[in-house]
């Protein structure tokens, strides 16, 4: 359910970014006029697409991984490896949340040149994605530990991809 909501949000942002770029090109080449706000808006949209997309890929298990050694481990050690991986992911989420939040506060009083919106809106994508990553990793640690104690694979995601 969460994946589908994220996919819809990201798709909407992508459609908006493509629409803004298309309109900017039409204005530039067909009407010989530039839209001064198109770059700033496209940049904001692409920032959110990037960070929300990274979180969605994490939820689906779609990030690049090398499993040559882990696949050869016995199930309990694979589970420990999974839990350790989630600890590292949680640490990354915390770093993004903490330092991204500091960046938001640092640039809150600065505005963009054309749209005159706070640049904090650009940076807010980092702590938002970091918080989501942190919560997801904590949830997967809990579920993974329970599954491991029950004698199952720790990773609850089917084939490490798809809906949770």
Describe each region flagged by the PLM.
Residues 1-164:
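Alpha-helical transmembrane segments and membrane-interface helix-loop junctions
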């Amino acid at each position: 359910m969460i994946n589908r909501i994220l996919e819809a949000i990201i798709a909407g942002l992508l459609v908006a970014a493509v629409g803004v770029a298309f309109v900017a090109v039409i204005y530039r080449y067909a009407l010989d006029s530039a839209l001064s706000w198109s770059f700033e808006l496209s940049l904001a949209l692409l920032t959110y697409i990037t960070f929300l997309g990274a979180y969605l890929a994490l939820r689906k298990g779609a990030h690049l991984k090398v499993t040559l050694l882990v696949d050869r481990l016995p199930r309990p050690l694979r589970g420990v490896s999974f839990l350790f991986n989630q600890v590292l992911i949680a640490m990354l989420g915390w770093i993004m949340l903490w330092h991204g939040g500091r960046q938001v506060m640092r640039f809150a009083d600065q505005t963009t040149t054309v749209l005159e919106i706070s640049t904090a809106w650009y940076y807010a994508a980092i702590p938002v994605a970091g918080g989501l990553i942190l919560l997801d990793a904590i949830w997967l640690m809990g579920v993974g530990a329970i599954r491991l104690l029950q004698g199952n694979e720790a990773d609850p995601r089917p084939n490490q991809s798809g809906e949770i």
